[in-house]
Structures are given as structure tokens and as C-alpha cells.
Amino acid sequence: MKAKLSSDIAYISLYLNNIGGGSAIFCVQARTITLTFHYICTIIPLTIMTINKEIESGDRPLNFLEEIIEESIAKGETRVHTRFPPEPNGYLHIGHAKSICLNFGLAKKYGGLCNLRFDDTNPAKEDVEYVNSIKDDVRWLGFEWAGEHYASDYFEQLYLWAEDLIKLGKAYVDDQTQEEIRLARGTVTVPGTDSPCRGRSADENLDLFRRMRAGEFGDGTKVLRAKIDMAHTNMLMRDPILYRILHTDHHRTGDKWCIYPMYDWAHGQSDSIEKITHSICTLEFDVHRPLYDWFIDELQIFPSHQYEFARLNLTYTIMSKRKLLQLVQNKIVSGWDDPRMPTITAMRRRGYTPAAIRAFADRVGVAKRDNVIDLGLLEFFVREDLNKVAERRMAVINPLKVVITNYPERKTEEFECVNNPENPEAGTRKVPFSREIYIEHDDFMKEPPSKYYRLSPGKEVRLRYGYLIKCEEVIEDANGNVTELRCSYDPASGGGSSSDGRKVKGVIHWVSAQHARRAEARLFDKLFIRENPDAADEGETFMDYLNPESLVVQEIFTEPSLGAAAPGDKFQFERVGYFCVDKDSAPGRQVFNRIVTLKDSWAKINK
């Protein structure tokens, strides 16, 4: 019942996030309060029955994008074509995963298409390595694109359209420096001032622009700007830059081009070329939409439409590519795939499943306002999926040796163990048992409190799938540390019962000392100790909130069946947590990454 209740609480949080635009944040007296499981449980009078019905049926409220699409369908506009347009200058993170799931998910739900388009307009920062990693991430999440496109595919068409704007008197070449352009743009309260070059004739601008393409000018000496309105209330409409000169080879076009389009120029026109119906961006691009529409209207091309939703923000997590790069460069983490990073490749290595990420992305909803999602929600979905698919194994993280004094010294037997109680088809396995075993240090207390059901002097406990044992003697070192236990066993208590019918509440896991395999466990935790590491106090940075215990490396003992596990295989170490075999594993020396604990230990610590 307790486990079921925790699941219900998590779903209440997700349910609320889909109501009224999807905000999971309430603002009370100018303070932003992020809803956590415990907070929701105490303040929200929703019944468990209502939530369970929604979960079982698979229904949830429509998000605002689905409402827009369904309204269009009702009017006969049935075509849905979306796109996911990453810039290939880094690795995707969990925020991108939400966008991937949204764009591909909408296309699938409404029988449409979703393109993968690389926004490769900045050759100085882009690389084919990132292109390949992005494709791997999208496929790993379970999606296949309708078409693979690149903004660079459209460089010629974008150039010709730029010439069209020049001929229409809607664009001009500017000789001002970047700083001069910035200062002349004005502020939100002060109008901008026209460039001295704004009055050039169309013929002069066309000649200069063609010479820019021919490579006659140096980097930064000229730009092409749209001629809109230097007094516009939206500063992005104050003659935005369309092209800049950059003598840098492109990873696809080589040295063919020395002028490159800016994002705002390439974005909407690429959408139009691909006949995208729903161009979905994050909220910060809301102010870009008037410019997006202006270009399409002036060129009189296919009218794609831009819509904005709130980006994903997670507690105890940073998403800034610049800050993530700092972590890598300063060797705070081992690389972009360090399992503590929020990148998709890191989550994959850690052992997160695509199904869990898809379920999380679906349930957090699509908001119109910025919100912050508790990291525990993501971990909840990871546990839910792994509980269904991960086979059970026994492993001891902090071993304490136990000698069963009345068990024959040379005897070995095997117990039949269930691989996954959630899936009968997973079958069973044999686990060896012998006179000496290892148990968890935490499963023994010399002076236990009341209602302590694990092992203590003179008390009995059941070994998982095995016998009842009783602690007869405690061996300590010179400092009083417990180093070994001497126990007796009841030979008639195998198979989960006892000859006299006595009941023993405590059940602990174990491994046979004779058969155990040594392995390395990497116990990962949150990378930051502050809920919002981006909100640094004066004189501090996000680096000041690093969790010194985000990685603990431990030598462990595992049951022998784990010797056949391969990198990427996932297991539940019974009573410990979920673990994944890491790529650093070598013959005779396996490495296991802790994916998540069995329970939300962080919430307990911070009560």
C-alpha cells in the first residue's frame, strides 16, 4: 500500500502539471514554490481514485498544442508536419528530449510527419560528431524522422531570397561594426537610430552582397540587415542581421560559402521550404515570432506557423550548454556522458530507459509558462519502468562476513530465485549457498531499536530465498568495529517456511562468499546540493553548489550469475537499487552504475 501511495502522489503532481497550461509552480506572495511530492500530498485535495482512473485509461487533458491542432482538424486543416531542429554544436540533454518527444509525438498522434533538421549555420562551433550523436539520441528515444535535412541544404535558396529582399528595398548591407550596431539599436525605452548605410540603393546593396559572397571582404566588415523599423517596440525588429561574413570551412559545404545566415533568417524559411505546419519552439522565441512572420509575409512563401512552449527545468540540474561545458573542461565530470550529467548520452549510460523518458516527457505536459519540475518525477518514471523490465539479482554493497557455524563446511547448495516477480516469463535462476556468506553491514545492529527486524545478537532473520539464521556471536576489531558474525541456521527452514510455523519478519539479501564476484559500484547522486544551482548567491557561482558525494565508488560482491552481464544490461539489486553495467567494465572486473535508488532517499534527508 505504501509503494502504491507514493506512485499516486507522483501522478497527482503530474496531473496538476497538465492543468491550466501545465504550470507546476504556484506563486504565493511573490515567492515561487516548486511543488514536490510531499507538498502536493498535504495541500491538494484530489482523490487517489480519480488519478488512478486516468492512469489506467491512459487519458490526460489535452495540452494547448493538441487543442490548436484539433481545432485546425475540425476546420478541415488535417495535415500535421513538425520538425526537431537542433544545432550540431553539442550533446542533447533532457530538455531536448522533451522537445523530441513533443514534436515526434504530435506527428504520430495526428498521423503526420516529423523532420530532423540540423540548424548548421555556425560552422565555427559545429561538428559531424554532434550530428551523429544527435541522430543516435533520437533513435535511442524510439523515434525515426520522416526526412533528414540541414539548413545548409538551403543556403542557395536562402541567398536568393536575401537578394529578393534587397531588390524589394527590404534589406541593405551595413558597414558598421558589431558594437556600433548594438549601440544604434537603442533600448526597450529608447528608439534606435538608422544606420548611415540604410539609404543605399538596391543596386548598390545587391553589388555589395554579391561581393560579400565572393569573399572580397574580411570577417566582420559587413553584414546584411533587414530594413524594418528602428523604432519598433520589439527590438528584434530593429533591422536584424540576416548574414555575416565568416571565412570558416563548414563541415558539409567546405569552403563554398564565406557568408552564413543568422538563425532568424534560416529558421522560418527552412520551415517554409519543408512545408512545416507547426514550428514548435521554446518560450524565449516568443519575441522572435513577429520577425518569423515578417520574413514569410515579405517573401510570400509557404506560411509555416511558430508556437512556443515552456522549456523543461529540473531541480538540482543545470541545462546551460556553456555551464555544462565548464563541468567537462574543469574535469568536474569525466565527459559529456558522465552519468551525473543531464545529457541524453549520459542518462543512457547511467541506465535510464527510453520508455521512462518518453513517459516523463508526456506526463510533465506542455506549459505556456516557465515551470520547474522536481527531479524526483523523472526518477519515479525510471523506477516504474525498470521495475517492470529489470531482472532481480543479489549484490552486497557494504559487506559484512557471516559464518554459519552449524552448516557443513564443504557443502554447497542452490536456491531457486525469481528473476522478476512483475514478469513471470522472466523465469528463475539458481543461486549458490555455502557456509560463509556476505550480508549488508546495514542489516546488522548490535544494539537495535524497537521494531528493528533485521539481524541483531540473539535474533533471527530470513535469508532471501534461503534459511532462517540466528546471530550467536559478534566479532569486533580493536576499535570496536564489527568485522564478522557467527550465526546458526535452521536446516528445516528452507523454502520460506519453518518446521514449527514461527514467523520471522526480517528478510535480508546475501551472497555466498565462496561464489561471490568482486565488482565496482559507482553510486551516483545529484550533482548539485542546491535545488536551483543557477540561482547563485552574491559572490558565488553554480560551481559552489557541487555535491561532494555525487559519486561514491565502492567495491561490492555480487552473485555469480552477474558475471555474464554485458554493458547496458540493467538489474535491480534486491533491497539496494537499480544498476546498469557500465562500458568501463573489463573481463573479470565489472562496473555497475547505480541508476536510481529503490526509494527517494533525497526527499527523506531533506524532510
Regions found by a protein language model. Give the residues of each.
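N-terminal catalytic cores of NTP/NDP-binding nucleotidyl/phosphoryl-transfer enzymes
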Residues: G58-E70, A74-K135, H251-T282
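Long, charged, mostly alpha-helical binding arms that flank functional sites
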Residues: P303-F381
